[in-house]
Amino acid sequence: MGRTVYTGRFSAPREEDEAIAREALEAVGLTRLADRPYTQISGGEGQLVMIARALAQKTPVIVMDEPTAHLDFKHEMVVLETMVHMVRDNGLSILMATHFPNHAFYFENKGLKVRVALMHEQEFLQIGSPSQVLNEANINVLYGIESRLITCQIDENHFIRQLVPIGARAGIQEGERP
């Protein structure tokens, strides 16, 4: 399960490591796949295995590079919810690189403390909460598309915020192919 930092490169896994690996698989809902080769699971399950490997390290911070890339909607939601539980249940901090600004709103909508650092041309454009940073002007600079920030009030204490591109061909110029 990738705990060689604790066990050494050539030593056999200890019972403690096996228990930690099982616990990590349980945390991401994949105990049923514990004995299946990695090459025989889906992309979404593979992402969850990678998250389980990170959890097994027992570190306070986990770095994730586009953890929902190439996933279908169902597995994207499973990965995002798993990340929410990692923060809430384990007190972890997650540093995540993503090209999807709505992921930050997703975590903010779940009540998590979220900080966003927007980068443009290898410079930090702005750092702050999703509501401060992910605005229409910044999205236009970053992606070259017009968008609108939609806020929907669910009840007196809960809002959902999401950036929506304007038009079906948002960002595609006349004569360009999608």
Label each residue range with its predicted role.
Residues 11, 37-41, 45:
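Conserved ABC ATPase signature
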Residues 13, 129-178:
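ABC ATPase nucleotide-binding domains
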Residues 51:
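Hydrophobic anchor residue at the start of the ABC signature
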Residues 58:
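Conserved catalytic motifs of ABC-family nucleotide-binding domains
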Residues 62-66:
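Catalytic Walker B motif of ABC-type/P-loop ATPase nucleotide-binding domains
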Residues 98-99:
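H-loop/switch region of ABC-family ATPase nucleotide-binding domains
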Residues 107-130:
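H-loop (His-switch) and adjacent beta-strand-loop-beta switch element
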